[in-house]
């Protein structure tokens, strides 16, 4: 048995295919999905979606969104996403360095919108790096 998986971003169909297993980065932690899963809707965090196809894993960096799970179908609607094998690791590592540098300009307890934006950019860069290396 397999799961039908669709990963959709506003301007593109990121991924569509069959999977043996899907692991989603939900806002409450990792969510493993096998065929026959109960129906549910969940918020997706910035992180890595992992898909098992023919006993091999494929990674997709997700930038937040929602997922709808129905028995043997998963539809993921995200702000943006990148297939791990298409990510330039050097660019992602440079983005991570720049975001960490931006954070270092603020005090630890400071709640500045620019600091919050930089923290989000760190999460995005880390997800891209992790997806590219898996």
Swiss-Prot record:
Recorded topology in the membrane: Peripheral membrane protein
UniProt feature coiled coil, ranges: none
UniProt entry tagged with the keyword Ion transport: yes
GO molecular function: ATP binding; proton-transporting ATP synthase activity, rotational mechanism
UniProt keywords, alphabetically: ATP synthesis, CF(1), Hydrogen ion transport, Ion transport, Membrane, Thylakoid, Transport
Primary subcellular site in the record, as a coarse category: membrane
Pfam families: ATP-synt_DE_N
Intracellular or extracellular location(s): Cellular thylakoid membrane
InterPro entries for the chain: ATP_synth_F1_dsu/esu, ATP_synth_F1_dsu/esu_N, ATPsynth_dsu/esu_N
GO annotation, cellular component aspect: plasma membrane-derived thylakoid membrane; proton-transporting ATP synthase complex
Function: Produces ATP from ADP in the presence of a proton gradient across the membrane.
Assembly and oligomerization: F-type ATPases have 2 components, CF(1) - the catalytic core - and CF(0) - the membrane proton channel. CF(1) has five subunits: alpha(3), beta(3), gamma(1), delta(1), epsilon(1). CF(0) has three main subunits: a, b and c.
Family: Belongs to the ATPase epsilon chain family.
PANTHER family: ATP SYNTHASE DELTA/EPSILON CHAIN, ATP SYNTHASE EPSILON CHAIN, CHLOROPLASTIC
Protein name from the UniProt record: ATP synthase epsilon chain
Organism of origin: Prochlorococcus marinus (strain MIT 9301)
């Amino acid at each position: 048995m397999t799961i039908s998986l669709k990963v959709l971003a506003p301007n593109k169909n990121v991924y569509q295919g069959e999977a043996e297993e899907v692991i989603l980065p939900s806002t409450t932690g990792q969510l493993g999905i096998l065929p026959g899963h109960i129906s549910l809707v969940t918020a997706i965090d910035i992180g890595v979606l992992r898909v098992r196809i023919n006993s091999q894993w494929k990674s997709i960096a997700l930038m937040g969104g929602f997922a709808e799970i129905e028995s043997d179908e998963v539809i993921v609607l995200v702000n943006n996403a990148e297939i791990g094998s298409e990510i330039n690791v050097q660019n992602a590592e440079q983005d991570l360095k720049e975001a960490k540098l931006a954070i270092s300009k603020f005090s630890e307890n400071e709640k500045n919108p620019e600091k919050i934006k930089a923290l989000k950019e760190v999460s995005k860069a880390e997800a891209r790096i992790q997806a590219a290396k898996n």
